[in-house]
Structure formats: structure tokens, C-alpha cells
Regions:
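Conserved small/polar residues in nucleotide/adenosyl-binding loops
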Residues: 142-144
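Anionic-ligand binding region
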Residues: 120, 124, 135-140
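N-terminal helical cap/lid subdomain that shapes the substrate entry/recognition surface
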Residues: 2-95, 100, 104, 115-117, ...
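Short active-site oxyanion
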Residues: 105-109
Length: 144
């Protein structure tokens, strides 16, 4: 069968609802560093453009020390990486659509602001990694 189409998917909020695990990681960092936790709706408005930007949006003017910001962002990434698929779930209909695309010989790839290794880990843990021919994450193409 000839391949005619390719679909490029975003990951967070398109294929997978990652907000609960992002919130857990964010609030872990806030507790650890003595700051106020956020609610799920707040986290959804902060997400996008990667962990550094998400944490910067959360800090706003509250935290001015760049070293502390970097420590908090590192803690976020470390915690999130260890807990990436605790509550994250496929968005309704995604599994059926991926199966349909595979049957129709549609090639598929993922492009995300997550680092590539976190994206691959999440896709593997939720058991959809094998649908994709390529996963491009933050910094994936830096060496090209």
C-alpha cells in the first residue's frame, strides 16, 4: 500500500492529557521550595513551550533569583520524569484514530516541547510509541 499522508501530532493536550502529572510535578516543586501550589486550571494555563517557560510563568515576579529558578526547574524535570505517566491518559478517541491511521498506511510523528527522552518515555508508558515513525522533542534537531 502506498503512503500518501503524514500526520504530525503535538503531544500534551492533543494525544495525551498530561495536565494531572504536570500539576503534580509543579506542586511538588512549590511545596519543596515553600511556595503556593496551583490548581489544575492554573496549570493548564501555564503549560506550553516546555518546563522552563511553564515554571517562569508560575513564578512571575515572585522569584527573582535565577539560580533558584534553575534549581526549581531542574527539580520539576527530575520529578516529572520519574512520575510522567502516573495520571496521564490518552485523550478519548486517540487510540482508535491511531489504529485507523496505521491501517490506512498514514505515517505519523510527534513534535513536542518536552525533551525527546521524556516524550519517548511517556509514549512508551502509555503504549502508543510504536505508532510513530519519529518523535521530535525539545533540542532534538540541535545537531543537524
Amino acid at each position: 500500500m502506498t503512503q500518501i499522508y503524514t500526520i504530525l501530532f503535538d503531544l500534551d493536550g492533543t494525544l495525551v492529557n498530561t495536565a494531572p502529572d504536570l500539576m503534580a510535578a509543579h506542586n511538588h516543586v512549590m511545596r519543596k521550595f515553600g511556595h503556593t501550589e496551583k490548581k489544575l486550571a492554573d496549570i493548564k494555563s501555564l503549560a506550553g513551550k516546555g518546563a522552563w517557560i511553564m515554571m517562569q510563568r508560575s513564578f512571575k515576579e515572585e522569584i527573582k533569583d535565577e539560580k533558584v529558578k534553575k534549581e526549581m526547574t531542574k527539580e520539576f524535570i527530575d520529578y516529572y520524569g520519574k512520575n510522567i505517566a502516573k495520571e496521564s491518559k490518552l485523550i478519548k478517541g486517540v487510540s482508535e484514530f491511531l489504529i485507523w491511521c496505521k491501517k490506512k498506511n498514514v505515517s505519523m510523528a510527534v513534535c513536542t516541547n518536552k525533551t525527546e527522552h521524556l516524550a519517548v518515555d511517556l509514549l512508551k508508558q502509555i503504549k502508543i510509541y510504536d505508532f510513530f515513525e519519529y518523535v521530535a522533542g525539545y533540542l532534538s534537531l540541535i545537531h543537524i
